[in-house]
Amino acid sequence: MTIYIATSNPGKLRDFAAAAAQDVGVAPLPGIKEIPAPAEDEPTFDGNARLKAIYYSHYASGEIVIADDSGLEVDALGGAPGVRSARYAEDKLFNGPSNATIDERNNLCLLEALCTMSVPHPTARYRCVLAAARDGEILATGDGTVDGQILSTPRGAKGFGYDPLFYLPQQNKTMAELDVQTKLAFSHRGRAFAALLKALLPQLQPPQIQ
């Protein structure tokens, strides 16, 4: 069985592929780069994940499509960037260096927001909510979180998003310093995907003949 992921983000696709259960394959939704993106205007991760799953499922008739909404919640910033994590620098009108990537600008914007606060080790969490839909109907959801701290300088090159700043004290490493399999054992996305599959797979089993 193949489940289609409504993302073209290579980092997310790599995480999902590594977390897939036995007999469950994952693949990017065909043609997703050409599909107009929906407005992610819900105030919660759950709302945006459901919105996207329903929307993209209409582009894959009869197939199961998974969408995620995930981000970083920093306690010292009142939970920001939150659902705006991917657009944090844009929202703050922060440009950064001209050659910086979107991820790099978001990271620099976060550090600038924290630099005026006397919080030596800002606590934070990654949060992910996944929703699975087929033909416009939600089949299951799953959520996962992981707690950590925000460093003042980035470390590691294996991750994406805020991974170079997100420090796991129990590992003495940032998310960006972990290999894919180790990361999945701790990551919000790996935990959310496991919860989603636990809720979804029983629904897909053929009924037993009495």
Predicted regions: what they are:
Residues 2-4, 10-28, 32-210:
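Anionic-ligand binding patches
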